[in-house]
Amino acid sequence: MEALGLFGAGIATLISRILAVMALVVVIAKMKKYKELKPSVSTGPEIHRMKHLLFLGLPISIQLGLEASSFNICAIFMGWLGSIPLAAHQIMCTISTLCFQIVYGIGAAASVLISQFRGVGDWHNVRRTANTAFFIGIALILMMIGMIQIFRYPLVSCFTTSEEVVSVVLSLIPCFFIYQFGDCMQITFANALRGIAEVKKLMLYAFISYVIVSIPLSYVFAFIFGWGGVGVWMGMPFGLTTAGFLFYFEFRSKIKKL
């Protein structure tokens, strides 16, 4: 069979997503503990529930969209610098996403526990869960930073054989390390706010952090200061750390009022 290249990669991704959905449907349908989750045929859409879901979901969607857009705009900036910086950016985004998903898993778990404690009015454990999740995230980040630092050459070489691209990726890794603290903070406390259903300000804080802080600084560092690809990535720690502190102070203020 003839190699399909990028088109084949797209087909493989589509198939994996379809199989994942099918697997989840089968698990929910067959396992007894998910019996209550099975939808009834007679169950129709409930307007008041739809409104509540939109009220909670839209700010979260906008917050996540703004964060993702800041990375996408940075990709455009890297493209202006040339194909080699753009390739390096894509490799770093892949490495960054892996680390993000690990920490995000802890944040998502914290969100579930926080919502349970909120439901029974146990605000002491709401606070403790958020703080514990943050420190677990920091511990995981330190482990990942150590592993990436030790194995950075073989890790980057898995993606490309181009020495030029490898060199640029290695120059971006310190920027990636710098923003891990802020990223962990914003992941943890954004999820904590979701757990207590306080999401309205998430999109405002995301707009401030990514649109007003991160993207302009990436441009200034890269093209006005002349730092190139490193400059693009140096804007990210400022945006993510700003988001982290804004989410943290919002969470703390909400907890104090309750």
Regions picked out by a protein language model, each given a short descriptive name:
Residues 94-95, 174, 207-216:
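Small-residue-enriched core segments of transmembrane alpha-helices in multipass membrane transport
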Residues 23-26, 42-73, 77, 98, ...:
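Hydrophobic faces of transmembrane alpha-helices in multi-pass small-molecule transporters and flippases
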Residues 1-6, 65-92, 98, 116-117, ...:
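Helix-terminus/linker motif at the lipid-water interface of multi-pass membrane proteins
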Residues 67-68, 104, 183-184, 211-214:
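Transmembrane alpha-helical core positions of polytopic small-molecule transporters
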Residues 1-58, 114-179, 221-258:
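Short alpha-helical transmembrane segments in multi-pass integral membrane proteins
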Residues 75, 88-152, 183-205:
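Small-residue-rich hydrophobic transmembrane alpha-helices
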Residues 187-188, 213-222:
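Transmembrane alpha-helical segments of integral membrane proteins
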